[in-house]
């Protein structure tokens, strides 16, 4: 299976808004920035972010646990921390599986 690897950037999102919605490039970039900042703000406050038909950014608190240094084998404590995971919606998974 051959696939080219690319990266979708903020500028790409702004360009898509510019083309589809007719906003200026600056307005489009401001929209992208505002949306991302709103999402980051919600996550900072401990809220999960759900985008219907796309997926959810979910915060999880991980407890302290004992890990092991792979080089030395010495046990070391891993401190408690908050991690963010992304879970794609069923619709997004189906669209990706179909190639579009």
Curated annotation (Swiss-Prot):
GO MF term (any one): DNA binding
**InterPro entries on file:** Hist_DNA-bd, Histone-like_DNA-bd_CS, IHF-like_DNA-bd_dom_sf, IHF_alpha
Q: Does the keyword DNA-binding apply?
A: yes
Record CDD domains: IHF_A
Q: Which UniProt keywords apply?
A: DNA recombination, DNA-binding, Transcription, Transcription regulation, Translation regulation
Q: Name one GO cellular component term.
A: cytosol
Q: Which PROSITE patterns match?
A: HISTONE_LIKE
State the Gene Ontology BP annotations: DNA recombination; positive regulation of metabolic process; regulation of DNA-templated transcription; regulation of translation
Task: Please give the SUPFAM superfamilies that the UniProt record associates with this protein.
Answer: IHF-like DNA-binding proteins
Q: Which superkingdom does the taxonomy of this entry point to? A: Bacteria
Q: Does the keyword DNA-binding apply?
A: yes
What Gene3D superfamilies does UniProt report for this protein, alphabetically? IHF-like DNA-binding proteins
Q: Which cysteines are joined by disulfide bonds?
A: none
The record describes its quaternary structure and partners as: Heterodimer of an alpha and a beta chain.
Q: Which family does it belong to?
A: Belongs to the bacterial histone-like protein family.
Q: Which HAMAP family match?
A: IHF_alpha
What PANTHER family does its record include?
DNA-BINDING PROTEIN HU, INTEGRATION HOST FACTOR SUBUNIT ALPHA
Q: What does this protein do?
A: This protein is one of the two subunits of integration host factor, a specific DNA-binding protein that functions in genetic recombination as well as in transcriptional and translational control.
What's the protein here called? Integration host factor subunit alpha
